[in-house]
Regions:
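Glycine-rich NAD(P)-binding loop of Rossmann-like domains
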Residues: 112-145, 174
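Rossmann-like adenosine-cofactor binding region
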Residues: 164-259
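Short loop/helix-cap segments at secondary-structure boundaries that form the rim of catalytic
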Residues: 19-23, 35-38, 52-56, 71-79, ...
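C-terminal helix-to-coil terminal segments
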Residues: 84-85, 89-97, 111, 252-308
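Conserved beta-strand positions in the Rossmann-like core of class I SAM-dependent methyltransferases
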Residues: 158
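N-terminal glycine-/charge-rich "phosphate-binding" loop or analogous flexible N-terminal tail
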Residues: 1-41
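Phosphate/diphosphate ligand-binding glycine-rich loop within oxidoreductases
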Residues: 40-113
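Phosphate-coordination loops involved in phosphoryl transfer and adenosine-cofactor binding
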Residues: 4-5, 80, 130-133, 215
Length: 308
C-alpha cells in the first residue's frame, strides 16, 4: 500500500540548517517544499510565520521551534490546524542563566573584576546560596528542571502554579496556588517567572505583588507581558526588589529610550536565556512527525484557549 505523502515548509531563522538536518533524517513519506500553498506541515519560528500564515491554507500541523507561540495565537483566532511547541530542552539553559546571575550577584564577581582593573585589593561580604528561598512561578518542564538544579546547591525551591499541586516527582519543597503568593513572598529571596503570556498572567507582576517582596532578586525568563514596567521600576526604587534580571520584554528589541538600559539595578539580556538549537528541535519534530503520520496524538500540543 502506498502511504500518503506529506509536504513540509520551513519558516525558520536558519532554513538551510534545518533542511540539512531533516535531509539526513530521511523521514518516511515527507517531502520538503518551498513557501507555498501545498504544505500540510510547517516547521516555523512563530514571529517569522505569523505574518505569512495565510500563505498556508492547507496546513494541518505547525511545529514551533520556540516554546512560546504567542505570535501565532494572536493570528489564529479560529484554529484550523494543530500547533505544537518544543518542551524539555530549555530547562538546563534557563537554570544556567538563573544560577549564573544569582551567584555573580551574591558573590560580587563582576565587582572583583572591576577592582582588578584598578589594582584594588578589597574584600566584600557575600552570601551563600544555601538556605535561600526561590519562588518559581510555573511548575512545568522548565520550572521543575530549575527546582531540581537549585535544590542541589542548597536553595529551597517553592513552586507556584494554577492548582497548588506539585508535579509528580518534583523537587519543590512547597507548592502554592497562584492566588496564595502574597503572604509567601515576604519570606523568599529570589523570584523566577517562567510563565507564559495568558489573560491570567498578563501584568501579574505588578505593584500589589511587589509590595510583599523584601529585597528579592527578580528574574523574568517567561514572557515580557507578565510584568508591569512602571510597577517594577517603583519596586526597585522602594527596595522591594534588589535587582531585576530581564530576558523577555513586551516589545523586542526594547526601545533606545527604555529606562531599563541605564538602570543600575536592572540587567537586560536580549532574549538569550534559552535558545532553540536546531538539532534538538529536529529531534522533537522527527518523533512527532512519526506519531502524526501513523495517526497518533501529537506531543506538546498547545491549548489555544489556555495559550500554552
Amino acid at each position: 500500500m502506498t502511504m500518503q505523502k506529506h509536504t513540509l515548509a520551513l519558516v525558520t531563522e536558519d532554513n538551510d540548517k534545518y533542511l540539512s538536518l531533516l535531509t539526513q533524517r530521511q523521514l518516511p513519506d515527507l517531502e520538503i517544499c518551498g513557501v507555498g500553498q501545498s504544505a500540510s506541515i510547517v516547521l516555523a519560528a512563530p514571529p517569522k510565520l505569523a505574518d505569512s500564515l495565510d500563505c498556508y491554507p492547507e496546513v494541518q500541523w505547525i511545529q514551533s521551534t520556540y516554546a512560546g507561540v504567542d505570535a501565532l495565537l494572536e493570528k489564529a483566532n479560529t484554529p484550523r490546524f494543530q500547533l505544537t511547541n518544543v518542551k524539555g530542552i530549555f530547562g538546563q539553559q534557563i537554570s544556567e542563566y538563573v544560577l549564573g546571575h544569582t551567584i555573580n550577584h551574591y558573590r560580587h564577581f563582576a565587582l572583583y573584576k572591576q577592582q582588578q582593573t584598578n589594582r584594588d585589593w578589597q574584600q566584600h561580604h557575600y552570601q551563600s546560596l544555601n538556605g535561600k528561598r526561590m519562588a518559581i512561578f510555573g511548575t512545568g518542564a522548565i520550572g521543575s528542571h530549575l527546582a531540581n538544579v537549585v535544590k542541589a546547591l542548597g536553595i529551597i525551591p517553592i513552586g507556584i502554579n494554577r492548582t497548588g499541586i506539585p508535579p509528580r516527582q518534583s523537587a519543590f519543597a512547597e507548592t502554592y496556588h497562584i492566588n496564595e503568593v502574597n503572604t509567601l513572598l515576604t519570606s523568599v529571596d529570589i523570584i523566577v517567572s517562567t510563565l507564559p503570556n495568558t489573560p491570567e498572567t498578563h501584568g501579574l507582576f505588578n505593584g500589589d505583588l511587589f509590595a510583599h517582596c523584601r529585597g528579592v532578586l527578580f528574574f523574568n525568563v517567561g514572557r515580557g507581558a507578565t510584568v508591569d514596567t512602571p510597577s517594577l521600576l517603583t519596586a526597585l526604587e522602594a527596595g522591594q526588589i534588589d535587582h531585576a534580571f530581564l530576558d523577555v520584554f513586551i516589545n523586542e528589541p526594547i526601545s533606545q529610550e527604555c529606562p531599563y538600559w541605564h538602570h543600575s539595578q536592572v540587567t537586560v539580556t536580549p532574549h538569550i536565556a534559552a535558545l532553540s538549537f536546531p538539532e534538538q528541535v529536529v529531534d522533537i519534530f522527527a518523533e512527532n512527525y512519526l506519531r502524526w503520520r501513523d495517526g497518533f496524538q501529537l506531543q506538546n500540543l498547545v491549548d489555544f484557549d489556555k495559550g500554552y
